[in-house]
Amino acid sequence: MEVKDILKTVDHTLLATTATWPEIQTILDDAMAYETASACIPASYVKKAAEYVSGKLAICTVIGFPNGYSTTAAKVFECQDAIQNGADEIDMVINLTDVKNGDFDTVEEEIRQIKAKCQDHILKVIVETCQLTKEELIELCGVVTRSGADFIKTSTGFSTAGATFEDVEVMAKYVGEGVKIKAAGGISSLEDAKTFIALGASRLGTSRIIKIVKNEATKTDSY
């Protein structure tokens, strides 16, 4: 797999709580230059970013982030607001307290409501795999499939661990037809990126891949 093909799967991400506009601009510029799938940024920057890229790049943002336990009504509003401001893709965090209470019907209904607001915009559902048992992850693969979401996503990158090969393998086995997989959090090498893609991920959430590509290009130029 060529580097350009990996880059096409990347949601180039900056979600740091202290992210400044110049830093966001760099993310947007790099994402456009390297033709990534999108740039994933905080909701407060979506409107400005959408104006800045002027249709040349998909803008992704997050809702219910990073803990997921805001109310469904709050998440629905966040989704609507983000789309009105120019977001093309929404990454939502599920309420893990519902999962731990075994209330998967509530999780599914919340996703359905948010997908209804998204309409044709892409919705990715973050399940925070590091907090789940294997049985919970398998159940959530069914929940996400039935809800009509476009992607199931491993991680926020703000919890105890990010994506693992094992979790993506489980997702690929149990998620329904038409639902894609996004691996996110801790993807720090091109080899890891290739492995996640080979296991079934069609999107990668990472802030590091472009930096790695730039460093490799610098090494090559210095020879």
Swiss-Prot record:
Catalyzes a reversible aldol reaction between acetaldehyde and D-glyceraldehyde 3-phosphate to generate 2-deoxy-D-ribose 5-phosphate. SUPFAM superfamilies: Aldolase (SSF51569). The active site is at residues 91, 153, 182. Belongs to the DeoC/FbaB aldolase family. DeoC type 1 subfamily. GO terms for biological process: 2-deoxyribose 1-phosphate catabolic process; carbohydrate catabolic process; deoxyribonucleotide catabolic process. Its EC number is 4.1.2.4. The keyword Plastid does not apply. It catalyses: 2-deoxy-D-ribose 5-phosphate = D-glyceraldehyde 3-phosphate + acetaldehyde. Disulfide bonds: none annotated. GO terms for molecular function: deoxyribose-phosphate aldolase activity. It is found in: Cytoplasm. This is Deoxyribose-phosphate aldolase. Keywords: Cytoplasm, Lyase, Schiff base. PANTHER family: DEOXYRIBOSE-PHOSPHATE ALDOLASE. One of its GO terms (cellular component) is cytoplasm. It holds the Pfam family DeoC. Pathway: Carbohydrate degradation; 2-deoxy-D-ribose 1-phosphate degradation; D-glyceraldehyde 3-phosphate and acetaldehyde from 2-deoxy-alpha-D-ribose 1-phosphate: step 2/2. InterPro entries: Aldolase_TIM (IPR013785), DeoC (IPR011343), DeoC/FbaB/LacD_aldolase (IPR002915), DeoC_typeI (IPR028581).
